[in-house]
């Protein structure tokens, strides 16, 4: 029996993960699909495509300087045959459950990770080699940073010099 760390509506597991990797120890730069049955990343493209992904995300710095960005997708048919019009809603519920685990692991190992929802869908789908009518990208999760994040200084409280409007009238 397969073990999944994140639940999914109806145990249909329609959320897939891809990795767009560049500077990752033990992994050649490329685009990979995660196979949960074997626990492996299967290469789809060789080479560093992080620039293409960052461009599709509007040049967001978190995507541009991440050593790896994970992309969550949903294969519509895996959920649609059973849940029909609720499929779209389930895509985001279930991907959120998967991504919560990814974020917890990233932060637990001291790596920056954020969820990015603003990107050009077709460009990301093309990079992954998927047809958005069958499997669509939902979120990007850049993990890590090419530049170390400095320690944050102590943040003092802000005490603005304001007078209540009622005192000025």
Regions of interest found by a model, annotated:
Residues 22-24, 75, 146:
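Solvent-exposed coil/turn segments that connect beta secondary-structure elements
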Residues 25, 78-80, 149:
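Residue-level signal for secondary-structure boundary sites
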Residues 9, 60, 80, 138-140:
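Generic secondary-structure boundary/loop-capping signal
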């Amino acid at each position: 029996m397969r073990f999944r760390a994140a639940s999914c509506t109806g145990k249909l597991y329609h959320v897939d993960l891809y990795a767009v990797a560049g500077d990752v120890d033990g992994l050649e730069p490329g685009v990979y699909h995660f196979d949960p049955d074997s626990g492996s990343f299967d290469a789809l493209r060789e080479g560093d495509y992080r620039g293409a992904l960052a461009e599709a995300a509007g040049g967001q710095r978190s995507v541009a300087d991440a050593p790896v960005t994970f992309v969550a997708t949903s294969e519509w048919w895996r959920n649609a045959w059973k849940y029909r019009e609720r499929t779209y809603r389930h895509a985001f519920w279930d991907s959120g459950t998967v991504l919560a685990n990814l974020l917890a692991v990233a932060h637990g190992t001291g790596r920056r990770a954020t969820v990015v929802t603003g990107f050009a869908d077709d460009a990301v789908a093309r990079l992954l080699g998927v047809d958005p009518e069958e499997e669509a990208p939902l979120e990007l999760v850049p993990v890590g940073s090419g530049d170390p994040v400095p320690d944050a200084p102590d943040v003092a409280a802000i005490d603005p010099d304001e007078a209540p409007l009622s005192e000025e009238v």
